Amino acid sequence: MEQPKKVADRYLKREVLGQGTYGVVFKATDTKNGETVAIKKIRLGKEKEGVNVTALREIKLLKELKHPHIIELIDAFPHKENLHIVFEFMETDLEAVIRDRNLYLSPGDVKSYLQMILKGLEYCHGKWVLHRDMKPNNLLIGPNGQLKLADFGLARIFGSPGRKFTHQVFARWYRAPELLFGAKQYDGAVDVWAAGCIFAELLLRRPFLQGNSDIDQLSKIFAAFGTPKADQWPDMICLPDYVEYQFVPAPSLRSLLPTVSEDALDLLSKMFTYDPKSRISIQQALKHRYFTSAPSPTDPLKLPRPVSKQDAKSSDSKLEAIKVLSPAHKFRRVMPDRGKSGNGFKDQSVDVMRQASHDGQAPMSLDFTILAERPPNRPTITSADRSHLKRKLDLEFL
């Protein structure tokens, strides 16, 4: 058996918990106080490659975000050729809970999990932070049953007038329709939509809207809620990648979730409002009658949790099953085939859809095959002076 290794004269590494694109997550013991922690080790690479901006952004944000429903950042330091980020240790995640068929989730259990998700988001939005990567395996669960938001690598500060963002955020199944139509300016409504998807997933015990491409994702959304009309979402036609879809009438939400309470359906319908300006806010959602009607939210200590994450996942995703902290994205971003057009990039798949629409064909019925290209490398910050980085991190954690 491999002996535990000490890192930075303080942390005693135990077993590997997970492995992703940018590094490894270890379970470790803090020799300073004996507590169990999770250490995310990120490869810095060669001098010319620099430090991954995502990791530094996550450190910066989590230093400012202190809340019972947000993962706690304990420490961060460079060691040898790696950047180490130390977090509180969490036992499992919400995806493992949802997938474990041996667990029964009562209406009170679902209400408790959703309430903790929304409380974490309410704090983030109060600090003008968008999470932008809400999904069940980024919602970690600790020994006391408390759910905490994690993986803030895609998070951004919002609220500045005119500020533009990329629309390629969130795993596709949790991506709001305005993002799928290429919106560059958005706010906390995108997190609300994702939280609604997670809410529905808790109720159904499976992902709610499972598109296999961005186009198919829109088709799944329209099949569930009907094709939006101009009076429902006036700004829709102004979005960069907007294409007119074949009209589909909205089915009854009750037909999709037949056993759910009326209060839960009402909250879901407000979280899935097409127009982001009219979509319910996190603060409004927490005040919805769903949370005050019976049954009451279950005490976190009494919430069901899987005995083993690995047992709760399919055998073909074992590494994903044991991730504890900031796991790698399970759904690789699918980028349409792009060709240069002027000074920017033009989405050829959108051109195909527009042409089909002009020809009188229904884009929703077309069979589009979008090839998955490797996304461009994330921008990096030069790390030539690593001693400067170490001094900076040391000062910040004094």
UniProtKB/Swiss-Prot annotation:
Binding site for ATP: 17-25, 40
Bias kind Basic and acidic residues: ranges: 308-318
Top enzyme class: transferase
Subcellular compartments: Nucleus
Keyword hit for Ligase: no
EC number: 2.7.11.22, 2.7.11.23
Protein family (similarity comment): Belongs to the protein kinase superfamily. CMGC Ser/Thr protein kinase family. CDC2/CDKX subfamily.
Name of this protein: Cyclin-dependent kinase D-1
Source organism: Arabidopsis thaliana
Top-level taxonomy: Eukaryota, Viridiplantae, Streptophyta, Embryophyta, Tracheophyta
